[in-house]
Amino acid sequence: MSNNDIIVSLDIGTSKVRAIIGEMNNGTFNIIGVGSADSEGIRKGAIVDIDQTVQSIRNAVDHAERMVGIQITEVYVGISGNHIGLQNSHGVVAVSNEDREIGEEDIERVLKAAEVIAVPPEREIIDVVAKQYVVDGLEGIQDPRGMIGVRLEVEATIVTGGKTPIHNLLRCVEKGGLRIKDLVLLPLGAGQLSLSKDEKVMGSVLVDIGAGSTNVAIFQEGTIVATSTLPIGGEFVTNDIAYGLRTLTDQAEKVK
């Protein structure tokens, strides 16, 4: 098993931190290991204690490493929260190949061109999500690779986030001895797994209820168009049951 075939994701939630190890095999992605640990230092989806969060990350990663028998050094990290914002953008470049065939380099350049927008100093760009490509005026293209053209454009959604929560998240992961491969918007990833292509095209609302917060995402015309995080989650239901029935939290969790 080559480490080049291994992908590790890290989900840092209010109640649990999970490290999920997947393996790419002949174009198929298979989960081969999951590490989980109680989350300390997170309240309502936000980091409130760096050291406790680092220890929770380390515990989850150690658990996953023991399950699979490999050492994890690099991870994809999920991110969400009310600091996340989406805005539309447009990028355009000239096709670089002499034969005018559009390649991976052209796609990378046009996505970079879409990133050239005004961003407030307290925010930074997390990701660029292509909605459609345009080749020499021909719209509605999802994958322009291999096509012939002179001018390549992209209509994209720019995902931005607050620098403070982003840097706190990165700091925790790095202090846990891990390199960050990339940040992934959690509602976007959840939509890829939970919604069909038709559901995303026709329009859908995806609600992901966590322990301390709830992510809401709206998909339309095949892509995410809005997202928000509510500071309420499953823990609130548990606490209401415990209060109403005059019982312990553990018992209320079982009732829920």
Pin down the residues of each PLM region.
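Nucleotide/phosphate-binding catalytic cleft detector across ATP-hydrolyzing
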Residues: 1-16, 20-75, 79-206, 223-225, ...
